[in-house]
UniProtKB/Swiss-Prot annotation:
Lineage: Bacteria, Pseudomonadati, Campylobacterota, Epsilonproteobacteria, Campylobacterales
Residue segments, region Linker: 224-244
Co-factor: note: Binds 1 Mg(2+) ion per subunit.
Pfam families on file: Hexapep, NTP_transf_3
Keywords: Acyltransferase, Cell shape, Cell wall biogenesis/degradation, Cytoplasm, Magnesium, Metal-binding, Multifunctional enzyme, Nucleotidyltransferase, Peptidoglycan synthesis, Repeat, Transferase
Entry EC number(s): 2.7.7.23, 2.3.1.157
UniProt-recorded name of the protein: Bifunctional protein GlmU
Length: 430
């Protein structure tokens, strides 16, 4: 059966208390809406996103990441509510799945369950130990027969633990017939998507309950919800990676972006952050180090090292308090307290403690090129643009501000001198 997906993302999300649209708040490095789109793309090639609040901003970000997404603007002034969002929406396939853009935790398996079978409507249902505050979904003989608001429940209905999770898979022809019939004769003057369930039941149509996990279908409406969803997503990511062979020390202290990838034997120590689309191959990241959007192979970083976006490290050791930015290091050792930015460093080179690439003049960034087997002594400043050829020794404390040819010693120290008895002249006799 072919499936179309409609994602509701028009809401303002006032409870977020943020100028950022609710659906663009990130979970594990990716906007919530993108998680919903990713899930939808696993089952459908016809995806429509419903927008209203900050629609241009959201559409621009989605189009930068995805192709062939259809956008529909909700006329929220005349047709508010979830049902109003569907006014004027048309989909290609025989069945339409309606998702919420603020549910980033839904899995493919749940969407497949919701879109299987031949019921006119499949309705997501959660069982809650304490359903207080929720309307109850009344189910008889494995069919939904009624949705009752809590204030209207009788004593028996109040004991019902089944509630609406808010996701529906509907026969498209039926949906297109029901949506124009929706009315807003309620206290909020909104058009509710739940009314299509009542229409179907009244017509004797089959509304099938699909039981789902609360964890997956929990909407994110506040910063507290966002933090809780992040915890769940992080747990999933790390459990999957550990099952695939990644070693983690105190995984609850580690953060991993959902776009990061790992190959071979990788180890992450406590407090590590892997951000962006980082790629790690046979690499050891030591405690409290940060890796951002970079490629690392057969390397180790830290403790307390930082590799910033655009870097490539192969067979390289980056030690404590070393920062690397947009640099290509192959077979390099940089053990302590250095900044390497916009650099290319060749095999066998050693970067001493306190070495700095001076890559920025206040207006522009410049490159530092270091060849193979170069020894850069401690407290050296490399003033870019500069090129150091192979087999060079840079003496400690040198400021390199011009190119260095192969095989030489570069040194720029002033001669040391001593002043006799200066201590006693300065402090007096002790």
């Amino acid at each position: 059966m072919s499936i179309s997906v409609v994602i509701l993302a028009a809401g303002q999300g006032t409870r977020m208390k943020s100028s950022t649209p609710k659906v663009l708040h990130t979970i594990s490095g990716k906007p919530m809406l993108f998680h919903a789109i990713d899930a939808a793309k696993e089952i459908s090639d016809d995806i429509t996103v419903i927008l209203h609040h900050q629609e241009e901003r959201i559409q621009k970000e989605v189009e930068a990441e995805y192709e062939n997404i259809i956008f529909h603007r909700q006329d929220a002034k005349n047709f508010p509510g979830t049902g109003g969002a569907m006014k004027g929406v048309y989909t290609r396939h025989e069945r339409t799945l309606i998702l919420n853009g603020d549910m980033p935790l839904i899995k493919k398996s749940s969407l497949e369950a919701l879109t299987s079978g031949d019921a006119d409507i499949n309705m997501s249902i959660i069982r809650l130990e304490d359903p207080s505050g929720y309307g109850r979904v009344i189910i008889e003989d494995d069919k939904v027969v009624e949705i009752v608001e809590q204030k209207d429940c009788n004593e028996a209905q109040l004991c019902t633990q089944t509630v609406n999770a808010g996701i529906y898979a509907v026969d498209t022809a039926l949906l297109e017939r029901y949506i124009p019939l929706l009315r807003n004769d309620n206290a909020q003057k909104e058009y509710y998507l739940t009314d299509i369930v009542k229409m179907a039941v009244d017509e004797g149509r089959t509304v099938h309950p699909v039981y789902v996990e609360e964890e997956e279908f929990k909407g994110v409406n506040s910063k507290l919800d966002l933090a809780r969803a992040e915890e769940i997503m992080q747990r999933r990511i790390k459990e999957a990676l550990m099952m695939a062979g990644v070693t983690m020390c105190l995984p609850e202290t580690i953060y991993i972006d959902c776009r990061a990838t790992f190959e071979g034997e990788c180890e992450l120590e406590n407090g590590v952050r892997i951000q962006g689309a980082a790629q790690l191959v046979n690499t050891h990241i030591k405690a409290h180090s940060v890796i951002e959007d970079s490629y690392l192979k057969n390397s180790d970083v830290g403790p307390m090292g930082r590799v910033r976006p655009g870097s490539k490290l192969v067979d390289t050791h980056i030690g404590n308090f070393v920062e690397v930015k947009k640099s290509d290091l192959n077979g390099v050792k940089a053990g302590h307290l250095s900044y390497i930015g916009d650099a290319q460093i060749g095999e066998g080179s050693n970067i001493g403690a306190g070495v700095i690439t001076c890559n920025y003049d206040g207006k522009n960034k410049f490159r530092t090129i270091i060849g193979k087997n170069v020894f850069v002594g401690s407290d050296t400043q490399l003033v870019a643009p500069v090129c150091i050829e192979d087999d060079v020794i840079i003496a400690a404390g040198t400021t390199v501000n011009k190119d260095v040819e192969k095989g030489v010693l570069a040194i720029s120290r002033t001669p040391m001198r001593t002043v006799k008895n200066f201590f006693y002249k300065f402090f007096g006799d002790k």
